[in-house]
Each structure stands twice: as C-alpha cells, then as structure tokens.
C-alpha cells in the first residue's frame, strides 16, 4: 500500500460557491463529474491517477453535511502554503490556524471554508 488514503470527499451546501473557493485558493480547476445520483453535484480536484496520487472531490448531496468536527483533510499547499492561505479570507473562508512549523515534516495551517468545513493545508515550505 503506497498511501493510507486514496480518495476524500468534502461535503458542500453550495456547489458553485465551493468550486469557486477551492479553485481560487489552490489555483486549480475543479472538474464537474457526472454521477448517476440525480440529486448530487460532484467536482473532482486534479490528481495523478497513473502514479497512484491521492484524489478527492467536493460533493453536494443531502446525505452529506459540512462540519468542523471529525476527520481533517490536509490539502496540498504547494511549495509554500502561505500562498493559498493568503487567499482564504478574500475567497470567503476564515483562517483558524496560521502557518505552523511541524519541524522536519513541513508546515500546516487550518481554515473554515465557505461551506463550514474545517480543512487544512500542508507544505514543506
């Protein structure tokens, strides 16, 4: 097993708002994906499936609710997570943990997204 995690889903209440938020702070495109469930909106983060990269999505459906409780998803903060973190507030989120040094493991930070989820960033710089 190369990765303990291979997929994550972040629940959202407003798909378009969340898609814009994550696209803005991470400077990437969330790709709309058709799911057979008619009452579901699904948008995938880019990932390298050929090299067993970890992927994920934002999901709007009634059975999934945004939360600050539970597991924390750590998104790739790039070379320096301050770049993404600096966009959180202007994109509609709230920084709840600034860039924090975790020794040889790099840096982490946490924020509340536009949907009310507690999400984190990780980078080595």
Q: Residue locations for each model-derived region?
A:
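Residue-level preference for short coil/turn positions at secondary-structure junctions
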Residues: 1, 54, 67-69
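Core segments of cupin and vicinal oxygen chelate
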Residues: 2, 9-53
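Vicinal oxygen chelate
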Residues: 3, 5-12, 31-35, 46, 63-87, 107-112, ...
């Amino acid at each position: 097993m190369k990765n303990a995690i291979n997929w994550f889903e972040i629940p959202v209440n407003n798909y378009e708002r969340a898609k814009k938020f994550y696209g803005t702070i991470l400077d990437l495109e969330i790709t709309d994906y058709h799911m057979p469930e008619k009452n579901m909106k699904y948008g995938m983060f880019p990932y390298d499936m050929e090299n067993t990269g970890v992927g994920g999505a934002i999901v709007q459906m009634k059975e999934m609710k945004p939360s600050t409780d539970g597991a924390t998803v750590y998104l790739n903060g790039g070379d320096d997570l301050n770049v993404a973190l600096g966009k959180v507030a202007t994109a509609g989120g709230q920084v709840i943990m600034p860039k924090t040094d975790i020794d040889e493991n790099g840096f982490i930070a946490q924020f509340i997204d536009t949907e009310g989820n507690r999400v984190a960033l990780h980078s080595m710089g």
